Amino acid sequence: QFKNIDNKQALAAIGQPKLMRIYDEVFESFGLQVAQCLLTYHDFEKEATIENTKNPIHTLLKHEIIPIINENDTVSAEEIIFGDNDKLSAMVAKIIGADILFLASDIDGVFDKNPHLHSDAQLITKITNLEEIEKFIEEKPSKLGTGGMTSKLKAAQICFENNVEMYIVNGNQNNFVENALTGNIPCTHFQKK
């Protein structure tokens, strides 16, 4: 029933405020305030739109307000078909000058084989050259989104081109940011040589 683009856009419009309510409640329990930033890939095409995207994010961060950034699926038919938040997050990391990007997924990182299909898959903990790992990628979309491992590698490419470190971590792990940085959880760290 909801397979065509118009219906998916309508569902996005219904779901977005519900999602933001959840974020608001969770962050508020830690004494933090959030703001919603809905973006499209067109926001990254011209210098003027890049500035219009970057400036509010910087202002929110300056005031210690956490921007919740998501694709604006209600108006972006292309992104419903092709989009993912992995690439979008890398593009945002680029324009705001981030040092590190964390991609929270349903797996611990990049494996030499798809861990959903192969029980003997081995985690690759450090990646300094994207070409070396492309042969390992077997696509399986994330359970929670449209972005599978290929989209994460596209995000890594953007990060490599802009000297942004990137981690793929299991978002179900407690304190995954701190624990990834200190090496206390399995994850994949991308850092260009």
Question: Where on the chain are the PLM-derived regions?
Answer:
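C-terminal catalytic "cap/lid" subdomain
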Residues: Q1-K193
